[in-house]
Amino acid sequence: MVKLRLKRIGKKQAPFYRIVVADSRVNRNGQYIELVGTFNPLKDEVKIDNELTLKWLNNGAQPTDTVRSLLSKQGILKALHESKFSKNTQTENKKPVSKKTTKKSKDN
């Protein structure tokens, strides 16, 4: 399973995290598939590439609890929810077009 999670970098007593897409079986600071953002907890600074994150979430990547809260604060989960369910409501609102054959009157 592919997960969106934090990868710790930085010094002792000065944590800094990368938000990465990684296989769930790989250790925390191991290889990752793609870098989608960064998080600095000391300054409470979050930088996330919205398009990449939405791409991975649409493809089935599961965020960890911490990353989920960061995504919701950035409004990315709301955008994901709206994109998924706005398609369903649009198709439900469309009425099926019935193909009725009309008889043409012949006036001679």
UniProtKB/Swiss-Prot annotation:
Organism: Mycoplasma mycoides subsp. mycoides SC (strain CCUG 32753 / NCTC 10114 / PG1)
Record-linked InterPro entries: Ribosomal_bS16 (IPR000307), Ribosomal_bS16_CS (IPR020592), Ribosomal_bS16_dom_sf (IPR023803)
Region feature Disordered, mapped onto this chain: 82-108
Keywords: Ribonucleoprotein, Ribosomal protein
Family the UniProt entry places it in: Belongs to the bacterial ribosomal protein bS16 family.
HAMAP family linked: Ribosomal_bS16 (MF_00385)
Keyword Ribosomal protein: yes
A GO biological-process term: translation
GO molecular function, one term: structural constituent of ribosome
Record-level GO cellular component terms: cytoplasm; small ribosomal subunit
Name by which UniProt lists this protein: Small ribosomal subunit protein bS16
Compositional bias ranges of the Basic residues kind: 96-108
Source superkingdom: Bacteria
